[in-house]
């Protein structure tokens, strides 16, 4: 009986690490001199979005820089962030919503499957909901498939999980 090896390609963000990064960013905003008297704040309620509020575009850009630096330190890939439009909010402030990408969208999943099939590696790739399953007989072929995916230009961070031998 031949053994089948497989792994999953997923895109997910650790919400606890995002919460930690947001708390660190808020602490820095509270203590920084250039934010004294500012209405700048970050709102994160364990939904896959972060709301940034600040006095003006310049301070909003600084809030984004602080948040991004804290996310990087916590191991969150910035490709997982989708920035919305900057819009006016109440009290002469500006607001921007940042969405956290969870799961692989259909068009990106198809791009991953196509890249693997075009590489002529002897594996099968299939879309399963918001992840891609790659299976093959040889572990070396799976490693080649991982390298193909890493070499493909994607708009999202990907992880390789759930290695199995069936």
Swiss-Prot record:
This protein's record includes keyword Nucleotide-binding: yes
A GO cellular-component term linked to this record: cytosol
CDD domains in UniProt: YajQ_like
Gene3D superfamilies associated with the record: 3.30.70.860, YajQ-like, domain 2
Domain of life: Bacteria
GO MF annotation, one: nucleotide binding
Keywords for the protein's UniProt record, in alphabetical order: Nucleotide-binding
Keyword Nucleotide-binding: yes
Coiled-coil stretches: none
Record-annotated disulphide pairs: none
Transmembrane segments: none
Entry function: Nucleotide-binding protein.
Membership in a protein family: Belongs to the YajQ family.
Name this protein carries in UniProt: Nucleotide-binding protein Dred_1927
């Amino acid at each position: 009986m031949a053994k089948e090896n497989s792994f999953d390609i997923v895109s997910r963000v650790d919400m606890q690490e995002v919460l930690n990064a947001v708390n660190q960013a808020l602490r820095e905003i509270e203590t920084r001199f250039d934010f004294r008297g500012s209405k700048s704040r970050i709102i994160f309620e364990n939904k896959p979005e972060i709301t940034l509020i600040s006095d003006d575009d310049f301070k909003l850009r600084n809030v984004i820089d602080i948040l991004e630096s804290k996310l990087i330190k916590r191991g969150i890939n910035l490709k997982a962030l989708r920035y919305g439009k900057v819009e006016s909010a109440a009290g002469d402030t500006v607001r921007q919503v940042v969405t956290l990408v969870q799961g692989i969208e259909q068009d990106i999943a198809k791009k991953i499957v196509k890249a693997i099939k075009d590489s002529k590696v002897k594996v099968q790739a299939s879309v399963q909901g918001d992840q891609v399953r790659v299976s093959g007989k040889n572990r070396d072929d799976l490693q080649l498939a991982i390298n193909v995916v890493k070499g493909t230009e994607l708009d999202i961070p990907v992880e390789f999980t759930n290695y199995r031998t069936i």
